[in-house]
Amino acid sequence: MNKVHFALFLLVLTVLAVSGFPSENAPTGGCPLSDNVCSSYCKKNKFGNEGKCHGTICKCSIK
């Protein structure tokens, strides 16, 4: 029965990972820790010249 329980556990984890955690809520560019890390993330990936954290999301802008 242990193999069956393990298989069910993996199935539940897979379903939760796919549907339960939308990617827009994931931390990006060092947020919420530092606006400086967010700014370098934007410059490095050529998303803009400046970056600012809005919660856990790094927002890049061109100024």
Swiss-Prot record:
Keywords per UniProt: Disulfide bond, Ion channel impairing toxin, Neurotoxin, Potassium channel impairing toxin, Secreted, Signal, Toxin, Voltage-gated potassium channel impairing toxin
Q: Which tissues express it?
A: Expressed by the venom gland.
- Give disulfide pairs as residue numbers: 31-53, 38-58, 42-60
Q: Name one GO molecular function term.
A: potassium channel regulator activity
Renumbered to this chain, the signal peptide range is 1-20
| Superkingdom classification of source | Eukaryota
Q: What is its main location?
A: secreted
Compartment(s)? Secreted
Quick check: keyword Cytoplasm in the entry? Answer: no
Q: Which PROSITE patterns does the entry link to?
A: BSPN_CSAB (PS51862)
A cellular component term from Gene Ontology for this protein is:
extracellular region
Give the function comment from the record. This recombinant toxin selectively inhibits mouse voltage-gated potassium channel Kv1.3/KCNA3 (IC(50)=24.73 nM).
**What family does the Swiss-Prot or TrEMBL record give for this protein?**
Belongs to the long chain scorpion toxin family. Class 2 subfamily.
Question: What is noted besides the main data?
Answer: Negative results: shows only a weak inhibition on Kv1.1/KCNA1 (20.85% inhibition when tested with 1 uM of toxin) and Kv1.2/KCNA2 (7.23% inhibition, same conditions).
Indicate what this protein is called per its UniProt record. Answer: Potassium channel toxin Sp4
In which organism is this protein found? Scorpiops pococki
Organism taxonomic ancestry: Eukaryota, Metazoa, Ecdysozoa, Arthropoda, Chelicerata
